[in-house]
Amino acid sequence: MTATTATAPAMRGGGRNELPPHLDDNLLTPRFYTTEFDKAAKTDLDIARKDFEAMFKEMEADYNLKHFDRKASLERLADLSPEDKAIYESYLVRSVVSEFSGFLLFKEISNRFKKAGRQELGQFFTFLARDEARHAGFLGRALKAEGINVDLPNLGNKRAPTFFPLSWVLYSLYLSEKIGYWRYILINRHLNDNPEKVCAPLFDFFEPWCQDENRHGDCINLMMRCWPGMTKGFRGKLLSRFFLWSVFLTHTLTVCERGDFYGLLGIDPVLFDEEVIVQTNNTSRNAFPWVYNFDDGKFLEMRMQILKAFRNWRESSGLAKPVALSKFVSLILRQFALPMQKTNAVRYG
């Protein structure tokens, strides 16, 4: 997820920001983003009025309100080794930062819309911010059950926000929500089939969680449709290519490098990464004008070559390091240029 302000580490006991010794303080150093808020305030809802009103009512209904029981215990169900405990807690910290940063971005967009007199759009993004805050709250409670307090309100004091054009923000937000949906739902399905791997009750909330992520992606898709120029012609193809490629590349590197978390749940990280990418690429046909063509299998096959090259570069030194970097860059650029397929995504205007 993205947001509009900068970062700070977590609070263990109050006053001083720090994580327990077995966790890396860099877990709480995400990037935050700002965008063209004045341009966003000019979003033309007239071309999408019927769909917007239907989506507004769905978000207003807050179907998952009762599913997130604030009184539910989030104490771990199983004792974990010190190593597995650190793996689980690291996942919680990364996730709470991601959800809270999403809340910050949606809240800022909401405030800017309302300030510009676009009350409907402002309330629309308030609903999205509500969901992200709820998710962050549950993750924060799960961390407290581990004896860790994350000072969320102070996650925004050190790093200056990075500016992205509105089109970049919408493309990346759509993918962030949809890839999140597939991650949560696939983990949920796996744990339903393998209940002995459920080490904490937090995972019981992944089904309503993924429903929120899916709806958020649909909301962002609606916003993209209100800006037809973002998805037309060469610009639309280039934006589709760049964001699908960059999000999938990042997912492969992070999932496979953090395979210990998936191992804790009994999930093969390589197969999980592949399924998430395939499903997200397919889902993106509903929003993007172009998606990657996976029919020949080349995109997916290159993932392991890229991962190996990345690890070689990271582990190399001296004169070997630039050579390893060159090979890594060559591979990812070849993957970037692989064939795409035109979609039949609904467009307005």
From Swiss-Prot:
The keyword Nucleotide-binding does not apply. Catalyzes the formation of the isocyclic ring in chlorophyll biosynthesis. Mediates the cyclase reaction, which results in the formation of divinylprotochlorophyllide (Pchlide) characteristic of all chlorophylls from magnesium-protoporphyrin IX 13-monomethyl ester (MgPMME). Its EC number is 1.14.13.81. Transmembrane segments: none annotated. GO terms for molecular function: iron ion binding; magnesium-protoporphyrin IX monomethyl ester (oxidative) cyclase activity. Belongs to the AcsF family. It catalyses: Mg-protoporphyrin IX 13-monomethyl ester + 3 NADPH + 3 O2 + 2 H(+) = 3,8-divinyl protochlorophyllide a + 3 NADP(+) + 5 H2O. Pathway: Porphyrin-containing compound metabolism; chlorophyll biosynthesis (light-independent). Keywords: Chlorophyll biosynthesis, Iron, Metal-binding, NADP, Oxidoreductase, Photosynthesis. It comes from Prochlorococcus marinus (strain MIT 9303). GO terms for biological process: light-independent chlorophyll biosynthetic process; photosynthesis. This is Magnesium-protoporphyrin IX monomethyl ester [oxidative] cyclase. The gene is acsF. NCBIfam families: AcsF, PRK13654.1.
